[in-house]
Amino acid sequence: VLSMVDGVLLLVDAVEGPMPQTRFVTRKALAQGLKPIVVVNKIDRPGARPDWVLNQTFDLFDKLGATEDQLDFPVIYASALNGYAGTTDNVEELKKIGNMRAIFDAVIKYVPVRDDNPDGPLMLQICSLDYSTYVGKIGVGRVHRGRIYPNSEVAIMDGPDGTPRRAKINQILEFEGLERKEVNEAQAGDIILVTGIEELNIGTTITDKDHPEALPMLTVD
């Protein structure tokens, strides 16, 4: 899944700091070259100790091999329950702000935009799979290059050394919140769901049938 994203938010408790289960996914994110935005949540909890939490987070990043740039992470303080966030750990000031806009502003400011090419030959890598009794196997992935349409003929490849195999897309869907909606086109940069191809695996590349090219297969831990 991390191969589909351009940035990550690391949510840490203002009292407890990074939890043991945080370590695995953080290591993966850092290895992907992603620069986390750290969100110190529950800043209004009694006993909140944001300075200690940030030191613990810095130490965790350092132990996981973070680069100097990744260690220089932006920080947002928030209370998700009460709906406010900002760049200060002063709770009274955060209450005056009264909204979560600071998180969205941080995403816009710090998450880089990929140079995806919507006009090149199609390249879409499947990163996860779902299943429906109605449409069968569903592939989820990001369009790395080009455009894709419903009912279009494509090629699928399992890695650069794989043999291109002809296939046909049925539906294309996009996420809209927790829902899925059918669309008539998707292009480079979009995260989509495709139906109609039963031979999909994690890491399969859906590519242009006339110019087949595959990304390296993904490793799954």
Where is each model-derived feature located?
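Structural and coupling elements of P-loop NTPases
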Residues: 1-221
